[in-house]
């Protein structure tokens, strides 16, 4: 059960989230892996989760009718949000807003086929008061098995 050096799913998700549109085209995604990227901004954490889940489903990163895939994605999203919000997933309740780029990557990071597929969610952007200029950069990463 070795993690393949060229198949680091979390690193790939982070690079995609950090990359500008022109930079993401030069990243080498392992064969058979799926991914999507997007942007979301809101004071409502439910909207942030819903936007990422919708992107993953509409880009066929996860199957819409398989519960375990949606469940794995949800937990990876929540883990990434914990990183961005420093463990407090409240936004509007404490007058915070986020503007994030996200990447969702699905693949097989381990040598052994028995380890199966994993999903990684990376978030990068800003968090702060809902006043222009009152925010700072934040980053989060979540990884879960499917």
Swiss-Prot record:
The keyword RNA-binding applies. The keyword Kinase does not apply. Gene3D superfamilies: Hut operon regulatory protein HutP. Keywords: Activator, Histidine metabolism, RNA-binding, Transcription, Transcription regulation. GO terms for biological process: L-histidine metabolic process; positive regulation of gene expression. InterPro entries: Regulatory_HutP, Regulatory_HutP_bacillales, Regulatory_HutP_sf. Antiterminator that binds to cis-acting regulatory sequences on the mRNA in the presence of histidine, thereby suppressing transcription termination and activating the hut operon for histidine utilization. This is Hut operon positive regulatory protein. It comes from Bacillus cytotoxicus (strain DSM 22905 / CIP 110041 / 391-98 / NVH 391-98). The gene is hutP.
């Amino acid at each position: 059960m070795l993690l393949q050096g060229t198949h680091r799913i979390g690193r790939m998700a982070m690079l995609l989230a950090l990359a500008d549109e022109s930079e993401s085209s030069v990243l080498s995604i392992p064969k058979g892996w799926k991914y999507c990227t997007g942007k979301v901004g809101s004071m409502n954490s439910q909207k942030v989760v819903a936007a990422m889940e919708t992107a993953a489903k509409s880009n066929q990163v996860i199957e819409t009718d398989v519960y375990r895939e949606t469940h794995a994605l949800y937990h990876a999203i929540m883990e990434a949000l914990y990183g961005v919000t420093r463990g407090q997933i409240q936004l509007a309740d404490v007058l915070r807003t986020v503007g994030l780029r996200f990447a969702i990557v699905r693949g097989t990071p381990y040598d052994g086929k028995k380890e199966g597929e994993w999903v990684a969610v990376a978030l990068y952007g800003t968090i702060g008061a809902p006043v222009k200029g009152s925010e700072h950069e934040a980053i989060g990463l979540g990884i879960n098995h499917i």
